[in-house]
Amino acid sequence: MPCREIFLLWILVPIASSSDHITFFGRYACNVDFKTDYCTPDTYVGRAFYYGLEDGGGITTNGTFVNSDITVEFFDPTVQGNFSIGRQDGNYMSSMLDIMLADTKKNDGLLGVVGVENDCKEIAALAQAYDASSLLVNCEDQVGESQMPSSTALQMSSTQGGKYRAFAKLAKSVGWNNLAVINFVEDGPADISYHDQLLDALSAESISLDFVKKGGFSSTITSAMFTGLESVIDVILETYMKTRIYVIVLDLPVSGTFFMNAMSTMGLLETGKYFVVMMSSIESDAANYFGFNVNRGNMIFKTIDYGISDADIRQYYRSFMYFTDVPHYTKDFSDEWTSFQKRVDGDASKTFCPPMCNTKAKGIANNDPWSDDAYWYSESPSIVDAYDLGRLLSETVKVHGASLLRDPESLVQTMSGRGVTSLLGYVTKFNTNGVSQREYILWAPQQASSSNGPIPLPEWATLAARMLPDGKGNYSIIWKNLTQLGIFNGELPQSKPECGFNNELCPAGIRNLSELEIIVIAVCVVAILILVGVIAYIARWIAYERRLESSYFLVHRKHVQLVDMTKFGSSRGGSMIQSAMSMRSQYEDSGPVGGATMNFYTNGIRKAAIRRNQMQRSDKGPAANRDEWLEIVDWHLAKYENTLVTVRKINKTQLKLTREMKQEIDLLMNETHENLNRFFGLINESDLIFTIHSYGPRKSLMDLLRNDDLRLDRMFKVSFVEDVVKGLQFLHEGSKIGYHGNLKSSNCIVDAYWRIKLSNYGMEQIRVEEPESKPDDLLWFAPEIIRRYAVKHDLSKLELAKADIYSLAIVLYEIYGRQGPFGDDLLDSDEIIEQLKFPDGGALTRPDIHLITKAPYPLASVVEKCWVEDPASRPSIKKVRELLKPLSKGLKGNIADNIMNLLDRYRNNLEDVIKERTEQLEDERKRNESLLLQLLPKSVANSLKNGQPVDAEFYDSVSIYFSDIVGFTALSSKSTPLQVVNMLNNLYTNFDTIIDKFDCYKVETIGDAYMFVSGLPEVNSYLHAGEVASASLELLDSIKTFTVSHCPDEKLRLRIGNHTGPVVTGVVGIRMPRYCLFGDTVIIANMMESSGEPMRIQISSDAYELILKCGGYVTEQREKIVLKNKLEVMTYWMNDYSKDARLARLVAHQEKFPHLEHLIHKFNKGVR
């Protein structure tokens, strides 16, 4: 064993005297260790054990175990015996035999051995032979194991075998079923045993060992070289196609560094597919491995001398974890740990010498087990184990008695199965065989904050997993989120590829491609896709050019048949729609307009046949001649390809189509949207230039808005707004056209389904040099367009789109104002256009916004935002649509959708109509029942509904409330009848709300008199007296804050009387039946009110008796009074009550009277 091992042995022996003793066998003096003058860690172990005995509460301040005569003695073999400082093998046994023989001569019995590190097997057997227990602190042999059983041994420390079994379970849990084990430790008896234990543990978990190598690396480490590198590379070459997970066992950590360096040299650490898990061949190893020595020494981080940079180390650790039982070092684990350090490290006290006989020597840097020095830090767990063992022993003796020390097997069995969380934070539990099962930890690198600079020590590591023992050989594994670690891809690799290293695990024909093959295939696929894309683009471009050259959009005039419109009462050059309605019946079924019905849906086939015949007859003559086309002023109705269309004239003498014009027309031909009017083509024959658009049978939006006989409800207006906005949004955002350019209500065509379709959009290049429009046509244009009208074709699409937003505002203004684009403005169009061009004194000319201020929110504000002078400040069409969303709140679909839904409902969903009517009938029935229940009790109402007679009913005990408003007559004389009614309505509404919180039934109100009762029609035992009393107090409180609306200075005062007694109830009359109470109780209750005083509650003696039974009420006896019948009675004043007492009554009677449950619910909700 290395020289750092703890030299400590305690023997627990009863001394032959008046009281038994426990002899503490171990070093407590410092000045003889290695012929120096400072304390070493094994001295701290003794102190820690003694403090554990103290803290466990099992010994007294003088060192005697509680409730016994067993005391603690101390024996230091280096001072009091012949123990050799060299501590060769056999020294522990020799000293122990000497003590045992001496005890035998003194006729003392051995109780136990504590703190053995060497010769564990032999000492445990010797202790068992002497019928003594052995409590082992730092023994690497597992004495309780089957190969060296001892029924009197309890082992505190962890062992290599335990660590290997824990690691095997961890590997199994993450699916590492194939491993390579590389053991750098050269052969020795203990090393061979540990190696075999590792292999056995892995085999027990059914983990295949694809490669195992023990020693034989012939490696030496100097300041400049690692001579075993070639043998390491040979191992990797032999194994990397067998496994991806390497388990490295080593005694010199830098060996692992060079192993990973070799893997990196071979390119195995670049993708995260290979992984290394390292373990030390000795226990208490984390400090040695992680390099807590402040000078780094020859730890794994000391790599610069071996030619490995910090940057390389950072890369290595991305495929690395370390498995250990020792917690990660930190200077302050907890306040408890810091306190423990100071306590064990404190000055000696001669009162407790031994064992606290020497102070800590000063000025010695490397003798501190609490320091960063890895050599001494490794002793900290031993010190803590000694403390925990002393505490457990003391606690056990405290609970089970000191006599347990005399029965070694019982002592061990009692302590087995117990667990402890140490001061360092790790968990230890004892198995049933007495061997500790220690918590194990898997450490991993942190995510690097930077890729440069030295690796921080020791903060580089972070906890990846904790294995918490259960005392039965199993563990609960708690993983940290792997994505927060510094390992590759934030995940652990598999021990084998999915298809195996040679594709042996995949079916024939399926195999894993190499990275080079994947790259080549990917490049080829990308190249093919690019080539296909280029070819497709070229083909599309050629087709596009051919399409433009073919002028496919040109329509010959002979294919368009003008329709004679004179017989429909309209001139050819007039409004497009004036004649549309008259010809609709001959050429198109336009849906429900004016007084039309819906029967065209049922006989559409017959009508369509008639229309086709009529159209064929009208087209038999020769094609319209040139003169007819020249007579067209603006537009004309025509037929093209058996479809009604409108031909609109372009006022030019000739039109030479340029490439830009063809591109513009091509866009018009290919744009389709439900809110765009279809463009059929262009007629370009000398001076006859016309565009062809689809015909709108329901007139334009302008014509609908100017038709005073046509009433447009909210649904129509909102639908029109949505259609215009959606069409404009498509032009701005979904079309290559990018703008409308001529938005006005006359260019908003209405189709057969009342859907708006934008027409006459685009074509700015075609309209170049066209004469300026008339002033009336310019009222929709934005001011910047009017000022630059002659060159507006040179404006960008963005500028024209911003101008569309202004035009949209005018159209919205028209829809809700219905008085034209500028409302009822008295100026004529020429003046308006002039002011738009040149604002007078900077004042802007806009339509009168007050005309649409009553329009639904937020139309007016949106209109104002859209027609601002600065185009850049106008919202986009997307923003406009978002702002107008509240306009359609509560409406579903558009006009056509609603019409079709209406038809479907009446034609196909008659059952829904019946169901709706049935539900309405049921709702009406419920309302009638509710009204009836407000007039009569539920039982009475049910009898009346069922046509049954309502018999009078006797109640032996109820409580009745009467109240009257003092001074009501005087107040009424100063008020109008309406004011009196309003006042009483407000007052009694308040009263009704209050008594609803109590188990009371309102009987009636007569003028200013208010009457209710409790105890009927729902019986509630004696609770009715309390319910009426509580409600009376609540009403009295409420009247104090009641305000008479027409006389705020007047305060109403109540006079209240309560009485308890029997009554008879019944329904009186047939017409307007009333639920009435009869009997002396009613009369006396009224007398209690009339003989009372303002703002007080007078109760009878009968009511008082039940009030006392209820409990929780404050009453005051009043002098006897004489009632109207000359009867002298004792009465009481009711002053206050306890709400909690009432709740307790209700809860106590809830089971017997279920109707009280809703009152409890209201009470708990705060409705008191």
Curated annotation (Swiss-Prot):
Q: Per its record, how is this protein called by name?
A: Receptor-type guanylate cyclase gcy-11
EC number(s) for this protein? 4.6.1.2
Q: Where are the transmembrane segments?
A: 518-538
- Pinpoint the Protein kinase domain residues: 562-888
Which SMART domains does its entry note? CYCc (SM00044)
Q: Which reaction does it catalyse?
A: GTP = 3',5'-cyclic GMP + diphosphate
Question: Which gene is the coding source of this polypeptide chain?
Answer: gcy-11
Task: Please quote what the entry notes about the protein's domains.
Answer: The protein kinase domain is predicted to be catalytically inactive.
Family, similarity comment: Belongs to the adenylyl cyclase class-4/guanylyl cyclase family.
Which N-terminal stretch is annotated as signal sequence?
1-18
Sites carrying sugar chains: 62, 82, 474, 481, 512
Stated membrane topology is:
Single-pass type I membrane protein
**Which CDD domains would you find in this protein's record?**
CHD
* Topological domains, Extracellular: 19-517
Using the record's annotation, list all stretches that form the Guanylate cyclase domain: 959-1089
Q: To which species is this protein native?
A: Caenorhabditis elegans
The protein's predominant localisation is: membrane
- What top-level branch of life does the organism fall under? Eukaryota
Tissue-level expression? Expressed in pharyngeal muscle.
Q: Name one GO molecular function term.
A: peptide receptor activity
According to its UniProt entry, the function of this protein is described as:
Guanylate cyclase involved in the production of the second messenger cGMP.
Enumerate the subcellular locations listed in this protein's record, separating them with semicolons.
Cell membrane
